[in-house]
Design a protein with these regions (language model features):
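Gly/Ser/Thr-rich phosphate-binding loop
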Residues: 18-82, 95
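Core-facing hydrophobic residues within beta-strands of well-ordered domains
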Residues: 31, 55, 91-93, 189, ...
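Acidic/polar alpha-helix N-cap and adjacent early helical turns
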Residues: 261-275
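Beta-strand->loop->alpha-helix junctions that form or flank phosphate-binding loops
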Residues: 58-66, 86-90, 195-197, 241
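Active-site glycine-centered loops adjacent to acidic/histidine catalytic or metal-binding residues
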Residues: 38, 63, 88, 147, ...
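Adenylate-forming AMP-binding core of the ANL superfamily, especially NRPS adenylation
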Residues: 40, 74, 80-128, 136, ...
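AMP-binding/adenylate-forming catalytic core of the ANL superfamily
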Residues: 43, 119, 124-128, 132-135, ...
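Single conserved hydrophobic/aromatic residue that forms the stacking wall/gate
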Residues: 1-13
Length: 275
């Protein structure tokens, strides 16, 4: 029977399909649409899903369990460049704003900040945990997602990372997802995760864990050479590790904190204590 839809739970599952050794044997000519959701999907993976899986009308959705779950989504007629690089626009009857995490004020268009959403889909609260509810939902009923996002002049939202994952190196704010998106463009890189690790000189340094494509040979010098002249010098990972897999939850979400903890152990690093 012909299938026309593909529903995926984020980039992990779609990458497994795209890189399956028998992928070329399957006829996907009847596929046309689907939904990508569950975890951030790199631009390069979205492009491959469109071109290699024939999903010309695929959409992407963003949200969280606490928002029932979708707050933003693209549509089948959203321009392709917006569908692969953003999570679309706010859903009908909901509100979204991007705020400065410190002041709580809305940031200008094109500037990053914390994504907040409000509307009928937002939960009433965490069962039996009023303190946690107050941390997440403010007095005006805005749900603070903890995600860093940018909204353009047309209302398209781009998720640039998690607030807790942002790396501050020598006073420079670095979003790991930006580095991941860049490294995905390397033809030998199958998957990559970037985290911050403690550093005595700069406070934090970047660390990249990389899974190479099957049969490919990669080393640190090749990765650094690929980065030079293409991204700012302080965004080039100081530590590069090649691995076969990332630590994940049972639902397929990558556990960056475990990568960070393992690197701290390997390198004998600890965060500097502050007053």
């Amino acid at each position: 029977r012909d299938a026309q839809e593909s529903r995926g739970l984020g980039d992990v599952y779609k990458r497994q399909e795209l890189d399956h050794p028998r992928f070329a044997e399957f006829d996907l000519s009847t596929l046309r649409t689907g939904i990508m959701a569950g975890s951030p999907c790199p631009i390069e993976i979205m492009k491959r899903v469109v071109s290699e899986m024939n999903l010309s009308q695929i959409t992407i959705a963003y949200g969280m369990t606490e928002t029932s779950p979708v707050s933003c989504q693209s549509s089948t007629d959203t321009p392709l460049d917006k569908r692969v690089a953003t999570v679309g626009t706010v859903q009908p009857h909901l509100e979204v704003k991007i705020v400065d995490p410190e002041s709580g004020e809305c940031v200008p268009v094109g500037q990053s900040g914390e994504l907040c959403t409000r509307g009928y889909s937002v939960m009433h609260g965490y069962w039996g945990d009023e303190a946690k509810t107050r941390e997440a939902i403010d007095a005006e009923q805005w749900m603070h997602t903890g995600d860093l996002a940018v909204m353009d002049a047309q209302g398209y939202v781009n998720i640039v990372g998690r607030m807790k994952d942002m790396v501050i190196r020598g006073g420079e704010n670095i979003y790991p997802r930006e580095i991941e998106e860049f490294l995905y463009r390397h033809p030998k890189v199958q998957d990559v995760q970037v985290v911050g690790v403690p550093d005595r000189k700069y406070g934090e340094e970047l660390c990249a864990w990389i899974i190479a494509r099957p049969g490919a040979t990669l080393d640190e010098d090749e990765i650094r050479t690929f980065c030079q002249g293409q991204i700012a010098h302080y965004k080039i990972p100081r530590h590069i590790v090649f691995t076969d897999a990332f630590p994940m939850t049972v639902t397929g979400k990558i556990q960056k904190f475990k990568i960070r903890d393992e690197m701290k152990q390997r390198l004998g690093l600890e965060e500097e204590k502050t007053a």
